[in-house]
């Protein structure tokens, strides 16, 4: 049996336990990459796919937050998932769990891009017509 007092042994246990935990925290802090570092380390193909699907993930997150707000405002039990079908219930099996349709999102973004391009083309056309009308004016005419 040890001749050291009990408090000394417990102090040693606390010190070594704290040292192990602190080492783990420091290693985690300095070896875990940030989101930007992680994305930068992706291959160009994976990074392009990540950037392409970012808008879809954001829309899904927004839809999920709306569902969570509706569900939390209701008086239903917590296990009722609102409009999200649970895979553990019979009517929720074999249902696609996606909250946002990727094809519809792609169509919306393409339509938005087309609208922006059309507005830009119309603006350029109006500018060109204005310049042509100014050029056609003679300095002596009242047009």
Curated annotation (Swiss-Prot):
TM regions (residue ranges): 13-32
KW Transmembrane (keyword) present: yes
Coiled coil spans: 103-139
GO cellular component terms given for this protein: mitochondrial inner membrane
Subcellular location: Mitochondrion inner membrane
Residue numbers spanned by region Disordered: 110-131
Keywords: Chaperone, Coiled coil, Membrane, Mitochondrion, Mitochondrion inner membrane, Transmembrane, Transmembrane helix
InterPro entries given in the database record: Cbp4
Keyword Iron appears in the UniProt entry: no
Membrane-related topology note: Single-pass membrane protein
A biological process term (GO) from this entry: mitochondrial respiratory chain complex III assembly
Bias (Basic and acidic residues): 114-131
Cited function: Essential for the assembly of ubiquinol-cytochrome c reductase. It has a direct effect on the correct occurrence of the Rieske protein, core 4, core 5 and apocytochrome b.
UniProt record similarity statement: Belongs to the CBP4 family.
Protein's name in the database: Assembly factor CBP4
Organism of provenance: Meyerozyma guilliermondii (strain ATCC 6260 / CBS 566 / DSM 6381 / JCM 1539 / NBRC 10279 / NRRL Y-324)
Gene name as annotated: CBP4
């Amino acid at each position: 049996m040890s001749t050291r007092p009990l408090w000394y042994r417990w102090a040693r246990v606390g010190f070594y336990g704290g040292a192990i935990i602190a080492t783990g925290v420091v290693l985690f802090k300095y070896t875990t990459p940030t989101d930007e570092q992680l994305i930068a380390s992706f291959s160009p193909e994976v990074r392009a796919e990540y950037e392409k699907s970012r808008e879809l993930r954001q829309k899904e997150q927004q839809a999920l937050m709306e569902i969570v707000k509706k569900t939390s405002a209701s008086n239903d039990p917590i296990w009722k998932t609102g409009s999200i079908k649970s895979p553990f219930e019979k009517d929720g099996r074999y249902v696609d769990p996606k909250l946002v349709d990727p094809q519809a999102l792609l169509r919306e973004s393409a339509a938005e891009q087309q609208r922006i391009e059309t507005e830009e083309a119309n603006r350029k056309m109006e500018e060109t017509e204005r310049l042509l009308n100014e050029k056609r004016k003679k300095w002596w005419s009242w047009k």
